[in-house]
Amino acid sequence: MTLNIATDHKQVRNPIMNEEFTVYSNKSVKYLNDATIVARLSHWNVRGPNFYEAHLLFERIYNDLGELMDGLVETLRACGFDPDFSLFTGPGISMEFFDAQSLVELNLDYLMALNSAVGIFYKFCEENSQDPRLVGIGSHMQAMAESILSDLYLLQAFAGH
């Protein structure tokens, strides 16, 4: 017996796979990937006072985001959607500062952008809840937002906001 956990896209009816859904899905994946890369680069490159605390904070954030990425892509694929993995080019930034405070601010920017993308995708799912797949994706987006919010609070506390 073979267990096929990936959805055969030819067998799935895809009324939700319209242009709006595609844009929101791909933006969520891209912003999540970019935020994960920025957190990992910050973890590797932080220097100076508060190094150890910031190093651990960035590690927690990229681990949290990595778990979110895995769940998001698996959820989207289970519903018959393949994210555009060509978007995984990274944020396209050069890091010119390595102090903890500046890197925390940079991570805050990326997490806020991610939170916005997740919120917009969640709203789309709520507005189209007649499709049970969107109810499931919406539930997943809501859980993602809670995790992202927790990381935002940690970064803001570190930054003294």
Model-predicted segments: where are they?
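Helix-loop segments that flank and shape redox-cofactor active sites
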Residues: A35-R60, F121-V135
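A structural signal for well-ordered alpha-helices, especially hydrophobic packing surfaces
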Residues: S25, V29, T36-A39, H43, ...
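Conserved alpha-helical segments that form or flank metal/cofactor-binding pockets of metalloenzymes
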Residues: Y52-L87
